[in-house]
């Protein structure tokens, strides 16, 4: 029975990391599309848009990194 709980912990960590990666990929895709749309509408604002784009992209990308850290913690420290 102990082996089943270990398998469930590994599965939970894998699902957590996978869903975080999928969510970040979708978010960055939408963000990139909106950046290109804004740059096409007002080309003179590209430097401002680029700065905001990279700041928000870093924040969106931080969520999967936190999930990977928590997943590895669950896999190696808790289990």
Curated annotation (Swiss-Prot):
Disulfide linkage: none
Family: Belongs to the ATPase C chain family.
Predominant cellular place of this UniProt entry's protein: membrane
Presence of the UniProt keyword Membrane in the record: yes
Compartmental location: Cell inner membrane
Descriptive protein name: ATP synthase subunit c
Membrane topology note: Multi-pass membrane protein
InterPro entries: ATP_synth_csu_bac/chlpt (IPR005953), ATP_synth_F0_csu (IPR000454), ATP_synth_F0_csu_DDCD_BS (IPR020537), ATP_synth_F0_csu_sf (IPR038662), ATPase_proteolipid_c-like_dom (IPR002379), F/V-ATP_Csub_sf (IPR035921)
GO MF terms, alphabetically ordered: lipid binding; proton-transporting ATP synthase activity, rotational mechanism
Keywords noted in UniProt: ATP synthesis, Cell inner membrane, Cell membrane, CF(0), Hydrogen ion transport, Ion transport, Lipid-binding, Membrane, Transmembrane, Transmembrane helix, Transport
Gene Ontology cellular component terms for the protein in this record: plasma membrane; proton-transporting ATP synthase complex; proton-transporting two-sector ATPase complex, proton-transporting domain
PROSITE patterns: ATPASE_C
SUPFAM superfamilies linked to this entry: F1F0 ATP synthase subunit C (SSF81333)
Organism listed in the record: Proteus mirabilis (strain HI4320)
Annotated site location: Reversibly protonated during proton transport: 61
Complexes and interactors: F-type ATPases have 2 components, F(1) - the catalytic core - and F(0) - the membrane proton channel. F(1) has five subunits: alpha(3), beta(3), gamma(1), delta(1), epsilon(1). F(0) has three main subunits: a(1), b(2) and c(10-14). The alpha and beta chains form an alternating ring which encloses part of the gamma chain. F(1) is attached to F(0) by a central stalk formed by the gamma and epsilon chains, while a peripheral stalk is formed by the delta and b chains.
Database matches in Gene3D superfamilies: F1F0 ATP synthase subunit C
